[in-house]
A protein has these predicted regions:
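Bacterial N-terminal signal peptides
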Residues: 13-24
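Bacterial N-terminal signal peptides that target proteins for export
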Residues: 2-15
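Glycine-rich phosphate- or other oxyanion-binding loops that anchor nucleotides, phosphorylated ligands
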Residues: 33-51, 75-358
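Hydrophobic alpha-helical segments, especially transmembrane helices
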Residues: 11-12, 29, 315
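Long, low-complexity, intrinsically disordered N-terminal extensions of eukaryotic proteins, enriched
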Residues: 14-16, 30, 358
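Boundary at the C-terminal end of the N-terminal hydrophobic targeting segment
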Residues: 26-32
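Mature N-terminal segment immediately following signal peptide/propeptide cleavage
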Residues: 52-58, 64
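Short Gly/aromatic-enriched secondary-structure transition segments
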Residues: 67-71
């Protein structure tokens, strides 16, 4: 064999290895490496209709997995997808990992490999509304990504395509309200006294997201919000689970206000972990956002693109930007947020089963 032939064979072998890695699936149950088909739905691993549950943190997923019966694990690109029965509902549960990219990747993997009738995001978040408290469980009606931005250097409304606010020649679209671009974030000026006089324009203007679906192809569409499923929201509004005030990991850490469940409003997600009270005030004043996390809006984008209804339950572990929050003693460590969130998710699954939705 000459050097050229040896090199060609190595490249061919590498190509086959990469192709195999892209298509391969390892299942602890042994059902791997083939595509199943049910009607028009293609499922690479299993085609039983299920609710798909995505969690970002292990503590959130573990509570749900502990109550899941008839569990069966599938390994997909190293991630564990667990099928089973949870509160009478056929489910598949995955730990997505933190971040917009991980949420996107693992939600799409779930939709590719299983027959998902509806999606549920289950997790914790930071509170944006100053009226919220640690341990509250929020169920927003819609989700958006305000950190998708056009960054204009001089702080003025961008207009690279001719008129102020027009960025369409770049394949982009500014987020608007009342026909006008939403205001950019004002950065506190060095040594400023606070208030509008103590800020400078950042030039960070919110953008709509571009999304392509089977229905809007080939032109696609721009969206700022992704709406949760009305039928799932209606069931969520009936829930009255008992929510704790002290964390199970440290019963001495208790919040001063009884946590509550609230359905409605807007949730937001972004690539940054928000620990900035000024930016929190900006997104509350501009968007009336209720909660912020790093996964749900990306998950919602994938759900919308695949025509799969969704809902998200987020329990507050802190007020984003946190040190000014009187309940900061309960921040993360007590386990209160994930326990309350799991209680609401489980109550929803009970109610969903009783509602006999398809």
């Amino acid at each position: 064999m000459n050097q050229f032939e040896s090199s060609a064979l190595r490249k061919l072998g590498l190509g086959l290895l990469i192709a195999g890695a892209g298509l391969g699936l390892t299942s602890q149950a042994g059902a791997a490496g083939h595509a199943a088909k049910s009607g028009t739905v293609q499922c690479l691993s299993e085609c039983k209709p299920r609710l798909g549950i995505v969690s970002a943190f292990g503590a959130e997923a573990d509570i749900l997995l502990a109550q899941t019966k008839d569990k069966r694990d599938f390994r997909i690109n190293g991630n564990r997808f667990t099928t089973g029965i949870l509160r009478g509902n056929p489910v598949v549960i995955v730990l997505s990992g933190v971040s917009m990219i991980n949420a996107t990747m693992n939600t799409q993997q779930m939709l590719n490999h299983f027959r998902i009738e509806r999606l549920i995001m289950s997790g914790i978040a930071g509170g944006v509304n100053p009226a919220s408290h640690v341990g509250d469980v929020l169920v927003p009606e819609r989700w958006s990504m305000p950190m998708e931005v056009y960054w204009n250097g001089d702080g003025s409304v961008p207009g690279p395509c001719g008129s102020a606010g027009d960025i369409t020649c770049l394949g982009l679209k500014l987020a608007t309200e009342g026909g006008k671009p939403r205001p950019d974030y004002k950065i506190p000026a060095p040594g400023g006294a606070g208030g509008a006089a103590g800020t400078v324009n950042s030039g960070l203007f919110m953008r709509d997201n571009f999304v392509m679906t089977a229905a809007n192809s080939p032109q696609g569409e721009f969206r700022f919000d992704y709406e949760a499923d009305p039928a799932m929201l209606a069931v969520a509004r009936t829930l009255t689970p008992a929510l704790g005030i002290c964390g199970p990991k440290n019963p001495t850490l208790c919040v001063s206000t009884q946590p509550a469940i609230r359905v409605g409003g807007r949730g937001i997600s972004g690539t940054a972990f928000m620990a900035n009270p000024d930016y929190r005030t900006y997104v509350f004043d501009t968007l009336k956002a209720e909660a912020v996390d790093m996964e749900t809006a990306a998950f919602a984008h994938v759900a919308y693109a695949n025509h799969v209804p969704f809902i998200a339950f987020r329990s507050l572990s802190d007020l984003a930007g946190g040190n000014d929050f009187k309940d900061v003693g309960a921040f993360f460590g007590s386990g209160l947020a994930e326990t309350n969130e799991a209680s609401v998710t489980l109550a929803f699954l009970d109610a969903w089963k009783r509602s006999k939705h398809p």
